[in-house]
Amino acid sequence: MFSLALAFGITACAGTAGQSGDGKPAESGASAQEKNAQYEGQLQDKQAMLENMFNGFLSAVRNGSDAETLYGFLTDTSEYWLDTLENHAKVYNSEALDTCQFYEAYTIILYRLYEREHLWETDEDRMLFMMLSKSGMLDRFTNLPLGPMKVKNDRGSIGLAKSPEVPIMIFEWDDQNWKLNLPETVPLITKGIESIAVKKNWNGKKLALYWIEKEYHMTYSRLDESLLEPIGF
């Protein structure tokens, strides 16, 4: 946008300096219009590509695609983040969990619940599948009515239909394709829940354990502080 503003500025200055008979100011104006049209066309192309990517992502999640396919929809930072969280789930004790944000503590505790209850359907990439499998953390939100995709330069987003201006998923353009940024998306998804911690003056760990118990108390027992410690990985 800065380059476009600069182009328009140069055109205006050329116009006030007087016109020669060779028509150059008109050419300059046409060039600016062409650039603007090209920019708008690129935005539309990116918008269409983002929509196609998102539909492909949803299809991959709901059809139980393999890890390689799912990783193909994610940024490199997302893959590193998943690996880091999985390692934390295996080694963090209760004191270490005090340093975590709510969404991190929730993910770690949920991972341990999966481990204790033998819920895994794979021996590898477990954090990935916990996040992205059918009925996983993201699938629950993408089944809600969603608003239109929005693109601004190399960033894309989508919100809920009832509040489309508030993003719940963030995408990044990597020169050829759109990728989902999980480290930025997950905090947006859990933001509404975090208001409980503010009201009750809880840290992220306490809220995470409370929310796990609230979600799963009808299905599993011992949803207590035992999940705050590593459980025999």
What are these regions (language model features)?
Residues 1-3:
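Sec-dependent signal peptide recognition
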Residues 9-12:
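C-terminal motif of bacterial Sec signal peptides marking the signal peptidase cleavage site
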Residues 15:
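Short, conserved catalytic or interaction motifs in soluble domains
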Residues 18-66, 72, 76-83, 201, ...:
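Short, low-complexity N-terminal intrinsically disordered segments enriched in polar/charged residues
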Residues 36-37, 44, 51, 67-146:
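Short solvent-exposed beta->alpha transition segments
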Residues 59, 74, 87-88, 160, ...:
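Flexible domain-boundary/linker segments
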Residues 135, 141-175, 179-233:
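Low-complexity, intrinsically disordered terminal/linker segments enriched in charged
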